[in-house]
């Protein structure tokens, strides 16, 4: 081994929730670990907290709730004294009014007003009398359930903002999963009975289910958790190589270890070696850096991502709304969701005279939004807040922009086959390589699910063989909505669930 090369038991690519969980737990078991992180300043990935002039921004919003007792215990171990309990509140904002989220049909009809709600009901009855016969797409499924008018108000705009494709190109199975339990007919009938005093316990068209009324949150944002994990890893005597990206990884058969070349921002390279490699880097990037080139390289290049940016505005005002965030169902603006950072934690906003909100825009890396200047994005966000009637632009006193590439793995019509091909080849060729986390597995994981995959990867290393299947950890669409924290003792909580995201329909030949 060259003197320039440094050896560790395990090399970890990426210091997000999955990478940091793996690094911390491996250190507890006595393994030497090197973590390689592209960001020169911060760990935490999409779960980091960004600070600007004393203001703290949560990128995407992270409620700390998990049904996995192992995950909850790890959070408490890392941050024993810094969690606060926060009220849970999210609503839909449409034409100057707030609507319940999850959507409650009778509440929606009441707030839409007599004329609009009447038109919605006519549209609903028309859909019931003349339903779409060939229901394969998201739009046709929703229209059959609620009518075209309610579809246009509460489903079409936001869904297309998030995923960047028309609703007619999304599959109906995703709609059925995401909107289950909501019935307009039941809601109207229930409302009539209530008006006659015949029903004292409204279900408002929703199946009765328990929603979280509060959640735990690190008092200085989610990055506080991952900074604590970093500090514990360093206390174990392990190391971080910040501002470095994976350049090439190859298995040295003669030496029996990985040889990993990493590159700093200035172009300088260095080599590390390790017995095991854990990657939370995007699948597309990992495969492109493996040598020799995997046969599944074309599959990796076909994987796509949805990107994301937050424009934080400081406003001379009281809080614009009490919610953690609101969903914007207006097609006249590009913003998809707005966070109120103080509602997450008062310590996120240092000045009581100012409000601080984060306008979230979904985009593709390199498109017009992503490529806009920070000044242009701050001006856009200010104008859109004013257009929505939420603030006077003259009250905006500052702003900052945070870009997050590859925030969401795209589930198009072919992604599953691509991932299966990549997984089959890499598992057969590299028994000591494990892929973890959201981007590392191209799966729409919450941070607790990402942590679970890392926990299983660590068990495989500790036990000396690939006994635990990381890919058995599924995603739960309602994980933050129902159930009690720590209900399940371990990763089994996620093995019985699936979080669907929209799939693009195949075009007819």
Explain the meaning of each model-derived region.
Residues 413-509:
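C-terminal lid/capping helical subdomain adjacent to the catalytic/cofactor pocket in oxidative enzymes
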Residues 18, 41, 284:
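Conserved Rossmann-like nucleotide-cofactor binding loop
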Residues 27-49:
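Glycine-rich FAD pyrophosphate-binding loop
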């Amino acid at each position: 081994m060259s003197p320039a090369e440094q050896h560790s038991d395990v090399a970890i690519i990426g210091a997000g929730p999955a990478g940091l969980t793996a690094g911390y737990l491996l250190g507890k078991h006595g393994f030497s670990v090197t973590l390689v992180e592209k960001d020169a300043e911060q760990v935490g990935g999409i779960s980091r907290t960004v600070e600007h002039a004393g203001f703290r921004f949560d990128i995407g919003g992270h409620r700390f709730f998990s049904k996995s007792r192992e995950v909850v215990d790890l959070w408490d171990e890392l941050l024993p004294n810094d969690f606060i309990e926060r009220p849970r509140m999210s609503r839909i904002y449409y034409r100057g009014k707030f609507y319940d989220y999850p959507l409650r049909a009778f509440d929606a009809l009441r707030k839409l007003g007599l004329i609009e709600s009447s038109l919605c009901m006519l549209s609903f009855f028309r859909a019931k009398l003349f339903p779409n016969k060939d229901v394969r797409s998201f739009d046709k499924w929703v229209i059959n359930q609620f009518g075209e008018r309610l579809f246009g108000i509460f489903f079409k705009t936001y869904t297309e903002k998030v995923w960047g494709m028309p609703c007619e190109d999304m599959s109906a199975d995703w709609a059925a999963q995401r909107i289950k339990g909501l019935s307009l007919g039941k809601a109207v009938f229930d409302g009539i009975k209530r008006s006659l005093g015949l029903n004292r316990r409204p279900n408002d068209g929703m199946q009765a289910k328990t929603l979280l009324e509060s959640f735990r949150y690190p008092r200085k944002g989610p990055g506080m958790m991952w900074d604590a994990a970093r500090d514990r890893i360093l206390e174990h005597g392990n190391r971080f190589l910040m501002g470095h990206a994976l350049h090439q990884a190859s298995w040295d058969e003669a030496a029996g270890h990985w040889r990993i070349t990493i590159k700093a921002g200035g172009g300088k390279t260095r080599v590390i070696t390790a017995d095991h490699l854990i990657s939370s880097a995007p699948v597309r990037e990992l495969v492109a850096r493996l040598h020799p080139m995997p046969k599944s390289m074309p599959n990796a290049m076909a994987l796509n991502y949805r990107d994301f940016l937050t424009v934080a505005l400081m406003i001379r005002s009281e809080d614009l709304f009490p919610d953690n965030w609101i969903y914007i169902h207006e097609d006249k603006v590009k913003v998809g969701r707005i966070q109120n950072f103080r509602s997450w934690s008062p310590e996120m906003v240092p000045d009581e005279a100012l409000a601080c909100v984060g306008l979230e825009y979904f985009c593709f890396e390199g498109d017009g939004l992503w490529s806009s200047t920070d000044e242009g994005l701050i001006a856009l966000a200010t104008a859109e807040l004013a257009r929505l009637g939420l603030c006077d632009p003259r009250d905006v006193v500052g702003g900052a922009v945070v870009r997050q590439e590859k925030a969401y793995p795209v589930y198009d019509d072919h992604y599953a086959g691509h991932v299966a091909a990549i997984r089959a080849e890499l598992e057969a060729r590299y028994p000591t390589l494990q892929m973890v986390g959201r981007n590392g597995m191209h799966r729409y994981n919450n941070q607790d699910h990402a942590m679970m995959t890392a926990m299983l990867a660590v068990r495989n290393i500790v036990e000396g063989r690939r006994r635990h299947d990381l890919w058995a950890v599924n995603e739960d669409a309602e994980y933050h909505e129902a159930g009690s924290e720590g209900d399940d003792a371990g990763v089994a909580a996620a093995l019985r669930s699936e979080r669907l995201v929209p799939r693009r329909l195949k075009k007819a030949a």
